[in-house]
A protein has these predicted regions:
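Short FAD-binding loop at a beta-strand-to-alpha-helix junction that anchors the flavin cofactor
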Residues: 278-297
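Short hydrophobic core segments
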Residues: 5-7, 110, 125-135, 169, ...
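N-terminal Rossmann-like FAD-binding beta1-loop-alpha1 element of flavoenzymes
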Residues: 3-29, 175-184
Length: 328
């Protein structure tokens, strides 16, 4: 029997697993979508890779002002291949880290049978504790599923060629980041935000300054605007038809929960995520939840700290989360 079975090998899950092992526990981690979670596979790492390329492109495009004549073509297929290679390398590093610390790895989709049993395919894992670390998934626009034309921040990475034009829906962190990067890489970008300014959860000066420089860079910014309709040609906003090849939805993320499974187990949750206390414990005495699925903060370092706290509680070394010291 394991001291813990952890479902999800993101920055919360794999840190928790390694910490339990270091504290002398027997631990198993289950993963179905690649090691490192959203951050490594579909978030921070590939986005920052694109950002680094965009930074090079921006500098090259400005080089003539400094007396340097340069011409270049962007080959997105090569760029994407290099980016995916970086993701694979980092994910493999996490896998090796887990194995090197004595963590047992099971690949597949987990189903919690009871508070002491987890099923993966036809295999039953018996455990004293369970840690749910299944992360979050993108929120879609009401009435529109993600498909070939409508992309999420997860499915964007499946695109083989950069679109010539794109509408980015949502002017928060992700939307502004994607809009800026894609604009530099040669896409015609429309950035749509329903609030009065970009980054609506930040001071007005930040949103206004950001909008100013985005407009200078050639991005069409539409604030106080809402998508009225999506068509084969593009989108209808404020009564205006905008023709775009792709639509990238960046309106937030939601906990990746199996509500039927949680109800069956009696685990308390709401639309924001699974309810936990400062020990990361649910209302079930041996089931914990960490990371985005708790609805606290969608930050990798928060998930990792939650994983560490959980590991210490599972192994009998009482510990609690202190959210007042989180760097943003």
């Amino acid at each position: 029997m394991y001291d813990s079975v952890i479902i999800g090998a993101g920055p919360g899950g794999y840190v928790c697993a390694i910490e339990i092992s270091k504290l002398g526990g027997k631990v198993c981690i289950v993963e179905k979508n690649g090691f490192g979670g959203t951050c490594t596979q579909r978030g921070c790492i590939p986005t920052k890779y694109l950002h680094s390329v965009a930074d090079i492109v921006r500098k090259m495009s400005m080089s003539k002002a400094y007396g340097i004549d340069s011409k270049f073509d962007l080959n997105y297929k090569i760029l994407k291949s290099k980016m995916l290679s970086t993701v694979t390398k980092l994910a493999s590093g996490i896998e090796l880290l887990l194995k090197g610390n004595g963590v047992e790895i099971v690949e597949g989709e987990a189903e919690i049978i009871s508070s002491n049993k987890v099923k993966v395919d036809n295999k039953i894992l018996e455990t004293k504790n369970i840690v749910i670390a299944t992360g979050s998934i993108p929120v879609s626009l009401a009435g529109y599923d993600f498909k070939e034309k409508i992309l999420s921040t997860d499915t964007f990475w499946n695109v083989e060629e950069l679109p010539k034009s794109i509408a980015v829906i949502g002017g928060g962190y992700s939307g502004c980041e994607f809009a800026s990067i894609l604009n530099v890489l040669g896409c015609k970008v429309w950035l749509v935000e329903m609030a009065e300014m970009l980054m609506p959860d930040q001071p007005q000066e930040i949103g206004n300054t950001l909008e100013k420089y985005m407009r200078i860079d050639g991005i069409t910014v539409l604030t106080n605007s809402k998508v009225e309709k999506i068509t084969e040609q593009g989108i209808l906003i404020n009564g205006q038809n905008i023709d775009v090849e792709k639509i990238l939805v960046c309106v937030g993320r939601k906990p990746n929960i199996n509500s039927d499974e949680l109800k069956k187990l009696g685990i308390e949750f709401n639309s924001k995520g699974i309810n936990v206390n400062k020990k990361m414990l649910t209302n079930i005495s041996n089931i914990y939840a960490i990371g985005d699925i708790t609805g606290k903060y969608e930050l990798a370092h928060v998930a990792s700290k939650q994983g560490e706290v959980t590991a210490h509680n599972i192994m009998g070394h009482g510990n609690e989360m202190d959210y007042s010291v989180i760097p943003f």
